[in-house]
C-alpha cells in the first residue's frame, strides 16, 4: 500500500488546527502575611493596581501596593480563615459592581450584594468602581435647580443638578436629616437617589431605611451601606461603589442625587489601610494621597453635555467636624474640592434653630443659576439681611438705645430666623416657599408676633391651598412670580380673615 505523504501532512495540519487545549493559565502567588484586612503576597509579578485577586477560601482582594518583592492587598470580606502560605490567583479583572434599575429600592453592601433580606438582585450590568471623571468638554454648566424642600437651603445656598455641595458640621447637628429630607423632596421630580452610609451603626441605617420606606422614597432610592462593624476596605470602597451605580443612570440621561454620609469615616478607614500597608504617613497620619482619595470621587459628579445624554450626578458629601473646626485637614480638602458648603452650627442647633444652617459660613458657588426666577426675586437680599441681623444682634447685647431703622431690622431678622425653621421630614414645595418668603420680604409678617410665626405659616399655606391654588400653580408652571398686586391682595385677604392682625 502506497503512503501518500501529502494526505498524511494534510491530516496532521487539520488535527493541529482543530486542537483546543483545555488547560487554564493563571498567575499565582503565595500569601506571606495576613492581618487586619490586609494581606501581602509574593509571586504576582504582573498584577495591576486595583486588580481583583482570588484567595483559596473564595474571598476576593484588591491589589493596592505593587512593590518589587510583593503585592499589598486589601481584603474585601472575611479574612479570618486566610492563612500564610495560601495560594492567591490573579483574575485579570478590575473591581466592578452591579448596576442598573434592579438595584432601586434595595439595600446593598459596597460589592453590590443585597443585605435587606429581599432575595437576589438580577442584573447583568456592571461598572468599574474606579472610572475617569467626565472631561472639560464633556461637561455642561449647572443651570437646573435641585429643590431640597428646605427653605434655608433653597433660598440662601441653592443647589443645582450636577453640583457638589458639602454639608459640614459637628455630630448631632442634623446633617443626615438634611439629606433624608432632600431625598424625600425628590418624589415625582424624576430623580434617582443613592444614599451611601459609611461607618454608621447598623441600627441607624435601619432607621433611615424605614424612614425612606415610610414616605415612599425607597421607590427611587438605592442604599449602599458599609457599617462600622465591617472591615476598613469596604468602608473605603463604599463611596466609589455608590458613584459607579450613579454613573450608569447619568450616562442614560437621567438625574441622580448621591449622598455620602460621611467622608470623614472613609478618610479614617483609608488612613488605617495605608498605615497597615506601610505607606508613609503625612499630616494627622493621613497618607499623602488623601486629597486625591476625595477629589477623584467628587469629580465624577457632573452635569454632562447633551452628546452624552445631558444627565447629572449631584453630590452631597458630609464631613464631621470636631468642635466646629472647619480648618481641619480633611474638612479643608473637601471644601476646596466642592462647589460650596453648608455649615451647620452647634450653637444654632441647641438654640432650636433647625435646620441649623449658619448663613455666614455657608456658600453655594453655583448660586443664582440654580434658582428659579421667583426664588431669585424673593430671596435676593435675604442672605445679606440675615448676616446684618446677626451683626446687629451681637451689638444689642450691650443694651444701648436703638433707632427706629435698627429696631425694624432686628424685628425683620427675628421673623426671618423663625420662617427659615422647618420641622423634620416635611419638605416644602418651592411654590409654597416662594409665597411665604414673599410675605416676609414685603413686610406682611412685621406685625405678627415672633412666637406665632410657625402657626401663621401653617395657616398661610392651608389658606393658599384652599383659596388660591391658581397662584401656586402659576409659580410652579412659569417658575416666576405672578403680578405683585395679585399676591399682595391674596396675602391681605388672608390677614383680614386671620387673627394675626
From Swiss-Prot:
<dbReference type="Pfam" id="PF00306">
    <property type="entry name" value="ATP-synt_ab_C"/>
</dbReference>
<dbReference type="Pfam" id="PF00006">
    <property type="entry name" value="ATP-synt_ab"/>
</dbReference>
<keyword id="KW-0066">ATP synthesis</keyword>
<keyword id="KW-1278">Translocase</keyword>
<dbReference type="InterPro" id="IPR000793">
    <property type="entry name" value="ATP_synth_asu_C"/>
</dbReference>
<keyword id="KW-0139">CF(1)</keyword>
<feature type="binding site">
    <location>
        <begin position="169"/>
        <end position="176"/>
    </location>
    <ligand>
        <name>ATP</name>
    </ligand>
</feature>
<keyword id="KW-1003">Cell membrane</keyword>
<dbReference type="GO" id="GO:0043531">
    <property type="term" value="F:ADP binding"/>
</dbReference>
<dbReference type="GO" id="GO:0005886">
    <property type="term" value="C:plasma membrane"/>
</dbReference>
<dbReference type="InterPro" id="IPR000194">
    <property type="entry name" value="ATPase_F1/V1/A1_a/bsu_nucl-bd"/>
</dbReference>
<dbReference type="InterPro" id="IPR027417">
    <property type="entry name" value="P-loop_NTPase"/>
</dbReference>
<dbReference type="InterPro" id="IPR005294">
    <property type="entry name" value="ATP_synth_F1_asu"/>
</dbReference>
<dbReference type="InterPro" id="IPR036121">
    <property type="entry name" value="ATPase_F1/V1/A1_a/bsu_N_sf"/>
</dbReference>
<dbReference type="GO" id="GO:0005524">
    <property type="term" value="F:ATP binding"/>
</dbReference>
<dbReference type="GO" id="GO:0046933">
    <property type="term" value="F:proton-transporting ATP synthase activity, rotational mechanism"/>
</dbReference>
<keyword id="KW-0375">Hydrogen ion transport</keyword>
<dbReference type="InterPro" id="IPR033732">
    <property type="entry name" value="ATP_synth_F1_a_nt-bd_dom"/>
</dbReference>
<dbReference type="GO" id="GO:0045259">
    <property type="term" value="C:proton-transporting ATP synthase complex"/>
</dbReference>
<keyword id="KW-0472">Membrane</keyword>
<comment type="subunit">
    <text>F-type ATPases have 2 components, CF(1) - the catalytic core - and CF(0) - the membrane proton channel. CF(1) has five subunits: alpha(3), beta(3), gamma(1), delta(1), epsilon(1). CF(0) has three main subunits: a(1), b(2) and c(9-12). The alpha and beta chains form an alternating ring which encloses part of the gamma chain. CF(1) is attached to CF(0) by a central stalk formed by the gamma and epsilon chains, while a peripheral stalk is formed by the delta and b chains.</text>
</comment>
<protein>
    <recommendedName>
        <fullName>ATP synthase subunit alpha</fullName>
        <ecNumber>7.1.2.2</ecNumber>
    </recommendedName>
</protein>
<dbReference type="InterPro" id="IPR023366">
    <property type="entry name" value="ATP_synth_asu-like_sf"/>
</dbReference>
<feature type="site" description="Required for activity">
    <location>
        <position position="362"/>
    </location>
</feature>
<keyword id="KW-0067">ATP-binding</keyword>
<keyword id="KW-0406">Ion transport</keyword>
<keyword id="KW-0813">Transport</keyword>
<keyword id="KW-0547">Nucleotide-binding</keyword>
<comment type="similarity">
    <text>Belongs to the ATPase alpha/beta chains family.</text>
</comment>
<comment type="function">
    <text>Produces ATP from ADP in the presence of a proton gradient across the membrane. The alpha chain is a regulatory subunit.</text>
</comment>
<dbReference type="InterPro" id="IPR038376">
    <property type="entry name" value="ATP_synth_asu_C_sf"/>
</dbReference>
<dbReference type="InterPro" id="IPR004100">
    <property type="entry name" value="ATPase_F1/V1/A1_a/bsu_N"/>
</dbReference>
<dbReference type="Pfam" id="PF02874">
    <property type="entry name" value="ATP-synt_ab_N"/>
</dbReference>
